[in-house]
């Protein structure tokens, strides 16, 4: 009878192992998670159980009837080995190939696994206490790839000894002699054909000898592969080149296979090897990538006197070596930063932080101008461009001569990165539902031979229908649960979450303060009352509301990536609400008014380009809008009115909307936008935003909720308090908006200045006492009162002011006021000396008495020859012109009247005592720009500029008053009292020349006043 035909595939076992390794790297079909140190390693239970007796016993401890391990024979049974390895291999072409594939991974255990898999699933999370993550990463790579790159090319004795000790504890025979001076892992001498000869005997038909494990691994330990860079994410099995993206690795593998098929056609014996040979045979003879042969992992370059450290993998350059070492974690196998919400592990902490934001929904990027928070930096940049007219990219970089951009050295960030509120501590404690006896004694076993002799661990004292899950807990006050599988139970009495199922689940319990779910992603919280935590601003998560159904129905229905056979549950969205209050927050609004009380910004300093430096102190109460009462709001408005004009405009924007959350806005912006006050006024119900501009979300939310609360401004008292608050400093008239007040002030000044569209007028008012420049006359008036308060004992400079109904007032009884914007000259002495002053003023007019005659009523002559002054003139500047006697009466011509020093202009030759202000029939046009035009001392006799057209014509049709000359002067009375600042008596000016071309009316007026001839 002819022997049965047999078909063998020598490359099947390496191909299956390579596919399993690729699945592990991608996280596919992994049914167990190993925790070593602070790192999570996903793996396959079948591969671990077939490679290590420790993992086999640890994974079988939760079975209902664990079979005692056999005490082992010399050679394993191919039938049982095939049954045990069927779970780890994807498919087998024949029984012999399955036998060879399984025997290569389980012969070192010296005992076959049980013939049938356990009835129930073992725990999915297994922690290895005391096992370093770096050494376990190397051992796990060896289990899956049959290759081990020794750290430092084998020269790092401490790392090699650590790997050897871990191999002895796990029962991996090939790693037991590592680090003890054995010759099993001494790197062989470089020989070109050293790896092809073991291949001829490794894949021959028939049962394999007991020492075949060492032979199979020896062919993988070529000198070139041993010196390759360790811990590459996705290495090519042919040439050892590493890749980060799996698609690039697949493209590279296709090219390597075509090259390996031509090189691997020779060197194979007649023992059944295929023409192409196994996929991994000739790969060991290929040289690895240049730069990774046991040398340094970086290249040092000197560019322009600066030392740069270049990564050998991706050729990125770094200024410091520590930055390069930190970057090298990206290319390594070590993923030290596992995600706290899923099974992903990241090489850098910032990668994990950016990833976890999508789980928690935290808004960490805060705009420093409006305190709005955003999830990503890109949303923040878009917001600042649209609402503030600022491009952060232009501030962080500058143009280069070739048209590009380079980063600035002193870049100021226009945002604040808030700390993570969902941050968890690293793994701290571990508790398992089953007794920990199977883990601890087995892990400390000195040799794998003693394991079969040890009795199997007993089952739990009171086993449940399903095995209890393993729980990883964190020491935080309130929990949020991550559920994988059917049923779970939170640790520490924090609550339970059950989904109903027969299999046990592993629960990772994070006891951090929970966050309310996002409204558009999660259903609203259940109506049942929940216990309030200690912090009043912290809301209660559905997982902590003392109910198993609450945690499942609220969060499991909205898991991020639901997969078949499990549900992923977590809480998201950070807590909102600064203002406190124990009620649960609504998920609708997440404005700055609902942030969880971050540390207040004591001072913000922003440099926007080269334009300005803005400094603003923000107290704790500024971050809590809507908490001030009506009286406090009034007090704050009064304080704002006393500030300078620069801060006054800003405060008007803050307080114009009443109780609205109008936070601080910058003074400067690049775009000439229309101001909020100019667009909609400062009415209570107005939005105060430019047209076409969408209001921010916090303002929309307040407007939507305005119907619920009746504002205080709706009452008559509140309406009167908010409507009339802008007062004119000239006529004491009140206005509802600042815009109307400014238009009214322009009417005072004649409306001569017109501002450009979209910009403020360039009018400025300078204080004569200091260098202060104010924007309005009202602000300058308030500023002048401060100077008066600073000099209580000084001699105030009197300003001529009259009372309208004072017919019998003596000229000496003048009202003395504090100096305003300009010290207009005064002739009055102290009260009581009015007669002497009036007699001196009757002789001639001095510069200190610019009194002009004219009016509807004649000046009343009192006893002593003094005259009664006309009604009060509220303006600090006297307007000069020819006066008229009512009824055609003419006053006596005393001495020569005021004479002009201009272009031959001559004022009317009336007596100095008859020169007075214009009375009521002539409305005076007083403009703020007139003050800025008089920066001179009035005691000086130099020519003074005169504002033209300052007097309007009479409304009764009497003719216009004489046109004021461009320059004028006064006759000097040498007996007049000197002014407050004493100056030498000025000389007398010659009489002015009558103006030419003044017209017939001017001549008639001079004739009536006795100035002819």
UniProtKB/Swiss-Prot annotation:
The keyword Secreted is annotated on this UniProt entry: no
Biased composition (Pro residues): 111-121, 453-470, 976-995
Biological process terms in GO annotation: DNA damage response; negative regulation of DNA-templated transcription; negative regulation of transcription by RNA polymerase II; regulation of DNA-templated transcription
Coiled coil (UniProt feature): 627-663
Record region (Interaction with CBFA2T3): 186-348
Gly residues bias: start-end ranges: 266-279, 576-590, 678-689, 883-902
GO cellular component: chromosome; cytosol; nuclear body; nucleoplasm; nucleus
PROSITE patterns (UniProt xref): BTB, ZINC_FINGER_C2H2_1, ZINC_FINGER_C2H2_2
Compositional bias per record (Acidic residues), positions renumbered to this chain: 629-654
Post-translational modification: Phosphorylated by HIPK2. This phosphorylation reduces stability and triggers ZBTB4 protein degradation in response to DNA damage.
GO molecular function: DNA-binding transcription factor activity, RNA polymerase II-specific; DNA-binding transcription repressor activity, RNA polymerase II-specific; methyl-CpG binding; methyl-CpNpG binding; protein homodimerization activity; protein kinase binding; RNA polymerase II cis-regulatory region sequence-specific DNA binding; RNA polymerase II transcription regulatory region sequence-specific DNA binding
Outcome of swapping residue 795 to A: Impaired HIPK2-mediated phosphorylation
Subcellular location(s) of the protein: Nucleus; Chromosome
Annotated keywords: Chromosome, Coiled coil, DNA-binding, Isopeptide bond, Metal-binding, Nucleus, Phosphoprotein, Repeat, Repressor, Transcription, Transcription regulation, Ubl conjugation, Zinc, Zinc-finger
Zinc finger (C2H2-type): 234-256, 309-331, 337-359, 365-388, 726-748, 765-787
Modified residues (Phosphothreonine): 795, 797, 983
Every BTB domain range: 30-152
Compositional bias of kind Low complexity: 67-110, 496-506, 531-554, 836-846
InterPro entries: BTB/POZ_dom (IPR000210), SKP1/BTB/POZ_sf (IPR011333), Znf_C2H2_sf (IPR036236), Znf_C2H2_type (IPR013087)
Pfam families assigned: BTB, zf-C2H2
Oligomer status and interactors: Interacts with HIPK2. Interacts with CBFA2T3. Interacts with ZBTB38.
Free-text function comment from the UniProt entry: Transcriptional repressor with bimodal DNA-binding specificity. Represses transcription in a methyl-CpG-dependent manner. Binds with a higher affinity to methylated CpG dinucleotides in the consensus sequence 5'-CGCG-3' but can also bind to the non-methylated consensus sequence 5'-CTGCNA-3' also known as the consensus kaiso binding site (KBS). Can also bind specifically to a single methyl-CpG pair and can bind hemimethylated DNA but with a lower affinity compared to methylated DNA. Plays a role in postnatal myogenesis, may be involved in the regulation of satellite cells self-renewal.
This protein's name: Zinc finger and BTB domain-containing protein 4
């Amino acid at each position: 009878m002819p022997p049965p035909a047999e078909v063998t595939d020598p490359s099947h076992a390496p191909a299956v192992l390579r596919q399993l390794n690729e699945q592990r790297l991608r996280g596919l079909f992994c049914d167990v998670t190993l925790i070593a140190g602070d790192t999570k390693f996903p793996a396959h239970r079948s591969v671990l159980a077939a490679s290590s007796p420790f993992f086999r016993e640890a994974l079988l401890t939760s079975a209902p009837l664990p079979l005692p391990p056999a005490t082992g024979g010399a050679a394993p049974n191919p039938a049982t080995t095939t049954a045990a390895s069927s779970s780890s291999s994807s498919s087998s072409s024949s029984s012999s190939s399955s036998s060879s594939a399984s025997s290569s991974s389980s012969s070192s255990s010296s005992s076959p696994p049980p013939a049938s898999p356990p009835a129930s699933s073992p725990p999915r999370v297994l922690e290895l206490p005391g096992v370093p993550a770096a050494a376990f990463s190397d051992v796990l790579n060896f289990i899956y790839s049959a290759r081990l790159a020794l750290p430092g090319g084998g020269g790092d004795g401490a790392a090699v000894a650590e790997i050897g000790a871990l191999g002895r504890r796990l029962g991996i025979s090939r790693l037991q002699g590592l680090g003890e001076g054995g010759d099993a892992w001494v790197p062989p001498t470089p020989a070109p054909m050293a790896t092809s000869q073991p291949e001829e005997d490794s894949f021959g038909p028939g049962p394999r000898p007991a020492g075949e494990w060492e032979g199979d691994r020896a062919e993988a330990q070529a000198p070139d592969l041993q010196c390759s860079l360790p811990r590459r994410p996705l290495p090519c099995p042919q040439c050892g080149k590493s890749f980060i993206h799996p698609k690039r690795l697949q493209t590279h593998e296709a090219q390597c296979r075509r090259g390996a098929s031509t090189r691997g056609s020779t060197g194979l014996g007649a023992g059944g090897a295929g023409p192409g040979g196994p996929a991994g045979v000739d790969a060991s003879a290929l040289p690895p990538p240049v730069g990774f042969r046991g040398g340094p992992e970086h290249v040092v370059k000197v560019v322009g006197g600066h030392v740069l450290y270049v990564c050998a993998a991706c050729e990125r350059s770094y200024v410091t070596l520590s930055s390069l070492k930190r970057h090298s974690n990206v290319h390594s196998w070590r993923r030290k930063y596992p995600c706290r919400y899923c099974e992903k592990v990241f090489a850098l902490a910032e990668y994990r932080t950016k990833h976890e934001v999508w789980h928690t929904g935290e808004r960490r990027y805060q705009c420093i101008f409006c305190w709005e928070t955003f999830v990503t930096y890109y949303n923040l940049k878009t917001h600042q461009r649209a609402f503030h007219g600022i491009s952060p990219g232009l501030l962080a970089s500058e143009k280069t001569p070739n048209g590009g951009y380079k980063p600035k050295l002193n870049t100021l960030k226009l945002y604040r990165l808030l700390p993570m509120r969902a941050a968890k501590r690293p793994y701290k404690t571990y508790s398992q539902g089953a007794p920990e006896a199977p883990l601890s004694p087995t892990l400390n076993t000195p040799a794998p031979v003693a394991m079969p002799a040890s009795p199997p661990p007993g089952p739990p004292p009171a086993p449940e229908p399903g095995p209890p899950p393993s729980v990883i807990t964190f020491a935080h006050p309130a929990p949020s649960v991550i559920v994988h599988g059917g049923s779970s139970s939170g640790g520490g009495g924090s609550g339970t979450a059950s989904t109903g199922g027969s299999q046990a689940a592993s629960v990772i319990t994070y006891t951090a303060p929970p966050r309310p779910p996002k409204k558009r992603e999660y259903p609203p919280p259940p109506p049942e009352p929940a216990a309030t935590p200690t912090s009043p601003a912290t809301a209660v998560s559905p997982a902590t509301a003392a109910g198993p159904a609450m945690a499942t129905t609220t969060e499991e229905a909205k898991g991020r990536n639901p997969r078949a056979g499990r549900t992923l549950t977590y809480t998201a969205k950070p807590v909102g609400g600064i203002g406190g209050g124990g009620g649960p927050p609504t998920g609708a609004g997440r404005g700055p008014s609902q942030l969880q009380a971050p540390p207040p910004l004591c001072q913000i300093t922003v440099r926007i380009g080269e334009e300005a430096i803005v400094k603003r102190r923000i107290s704790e109460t500024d971050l809590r809008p809507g908490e001030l009462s009506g009286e406090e709001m009034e007090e704050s408005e009064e304080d704002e009115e006393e500030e300078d004009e620069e801060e006054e405009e800003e405060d008007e924007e803050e307080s114009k909307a009443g109780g609205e959350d109008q936070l601080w806005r910058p003074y400067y912006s690049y775009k000439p936008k229309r101001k909020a006050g100019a667009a909609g006024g400062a009415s209570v119900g107005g939005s105060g935003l430019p047209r076409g501009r969408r209001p921010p979300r916090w303002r929309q939310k307040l407007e939507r909720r305005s119907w619920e609360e009746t504002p205080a401004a709706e009452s008559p008292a509140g309406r009167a308090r908010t409507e009339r608050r802008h007062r004119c400093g000239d006529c004491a008239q009140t206005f509802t908006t600042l815009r109307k007040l400014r238009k009214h002030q322009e009417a005072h000044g004649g409306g001569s200045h017109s501002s450009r569209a979209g910009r403020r007028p360039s009018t400025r008012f300078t204080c004569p006492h200091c260098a202060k420049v104010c924007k309005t006359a009202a602000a300058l008036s308030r500023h002048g009162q401060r100077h008066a308060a600073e000099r209580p004992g000084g001699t105030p400079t009197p300003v001529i002011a009259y009372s309208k109904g004072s017919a019998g007032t003596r000229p000496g009884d003048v009202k003395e006021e504090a100096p305003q914007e300009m010290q207009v000259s005064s002739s009055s002495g102290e009260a009581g000396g009015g007669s002497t002053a009036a007699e001196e003023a009757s002789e001639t007019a001095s510069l200190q008495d610019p009194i002009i005659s004219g009016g509807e009523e004649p000046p009343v002559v009192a006893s002593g020859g003094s005259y009664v002054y006309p009604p009060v003139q509220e303006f600090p500047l006297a307007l000069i012109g020819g006066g008229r006697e009512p009824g055609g009466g003419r006053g006596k011509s005393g001495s020569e009247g005021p004479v002009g020093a201009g272009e031959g202009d001559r004022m009317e030759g009336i007596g100095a005592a008859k020169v007075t202000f214009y009375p009521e029939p002539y409305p005076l046009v007083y403009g703020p720009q007139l003050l800025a035009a008089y920066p001179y001392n009035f005691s000086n006799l130099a020519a003074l500029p005169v504002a033209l057209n300052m007097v309007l014509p009479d409304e009764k049709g009497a003719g216009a008053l004489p046109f004021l000359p461009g320059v004028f002067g006064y006759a000097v009375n040498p007996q007049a009292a000197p002014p407050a600042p004493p100056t030498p008596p000025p000389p007398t000016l010659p009489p002015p020349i009558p103006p030419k071309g003044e017209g017939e009316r001017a001549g008639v007026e001079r004739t009536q006043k006795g100035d002819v001839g």
